[in-house]
Amino acid sequence: MTDEPLGSHVLELQVAEVVEETSDARSLVFTVPEGAEIAADRLRYSPGQFLTLRVPSDRTGSVARCYSLSSSPTTDDRLTVTVKRTADGYASNWLCDNAHAGMRIHVLAPSGTFVPKDLDTDFLLLAAGSGITPMMAICKSALAEGTGNVVLIYANRDENSVIFAGALRELAAKYPDRLTVVHWLETVQGLPTAAGLGALAKPFAGREAFICGPGPFMTAAEDALRAAGTPDDHIHIEVFKSLESDPFAAVVIPEDDGDDQGPATAVVTLDGTTHEIRWPRSAKLLDVLLDKGLDAPFSCREGHCGACAVLKKSGEVHMEINDVLEPSDLEEGLILGCQATPVSDSVEVTYDE
């Protein structure tokens, strides 16, 4: 990833505090730098979403990485992400070693689809390691704002590697009738298995279930839930991939992309306003919107995260990559703005439904 001019969609936050959660995990608490003007809605977020951080790199200029927000929009005043070192992870190690109070970091607006549709329901949360970060946001929000009960099954290597151990004890003491935390320690029980997780999850199989953690854990947890009878539409999984391109770079749309058909027309409804925009055939919908200064949601710009999903009302598009939308999503008309190019002469989409 090379250093390119930053787009107008890029925000700059300041690290107010770095909290050592465990020997290999840090929470970065952010604030808006003094004198900076960032509209409040640019930082508005939902529990389960993430921030994309621009991490400096001597080799490539910078790398972009997504980190879940462990703060809750209901209970916390400041955005917080929690980062755990990974063996070969440049960005996580750099942040754990170098992040400090006063440091400024470029970020993208909070994004992501790993979000409960309704906090007034019962939840089953399955997390391993740093997968606890979005679960903390969901858990705190559900308990403070919702009315349902929460069961958290949380796997770690040992007691010393449990991120948020103290905070979870405090929440359990505050909500003894609504929060149940079940710890799985590899030093005691071995690696989590589908059978073991299934035994713990079976009494709660009908709940909205959220899964986040390393790949093998998520596979075991998903298998456990399906075996226990949890409906597919109740299973929600968060997967992060390293980004290859630079989502922070400014977008440049060519006036003429050389297509004999000429540009298509995009009719886009966003935040209550409908825009009619020239759409070159080779350009991605998201890039066209950003080029016009529209604040369309996105994160990875690579078809992996689903943050840019938008509802297509009419017309046809082609998506180069789709790693996140299910067949049912496609049937409903959802498309990925970062991957969609026009097939028909006119395409109508809305972000407001």
Swiss-Prot record:
Keyword check for DNA-binding: no
Binding site for [2Fe-2S] cluster: 300, 305, 308, 338
Free-text comment on the cofactor: Binds 1 FAD per subunit.
Alphabetized GO MF terms: 2 iron, 2 sulfur cluster binding; 3-ketosteroid 9-alpha-monooxygenase activity; flavin adenine dinucleotide binding; metal ion binding
Principal EC category: oxidoreductase
Pfam families (alphabetical): FAD_binding_6 (PF00970), Fer2 (PF00111), NAD_binding_1 (PF00175)
Domain 2Fe-2S ferredoxin-type: 264-353
Sorted UniProt keywords: 2Fe-2S, Cholesterol metabolism, FAD, Flavoprotein, Iron, Iron-sulfur, Lipid degradation, Lipid metabolism, Metal-binding, Oxidoreductase, Steroid metabolism, Sterol metabolism
FAD-binding FR-type domain: residues covered: 8-117
Record-given protein name: 3-ketosteroid-9-alpha-monooxygenase, ferredoxin reductase component
Native organism: Mycolicibacterium smegmatis (strain ATCC 700084 / mc(2)155)
Lineage: Bacteria, Bacillati, Actinomycetota, Actinomycetes, Mycobacteriales
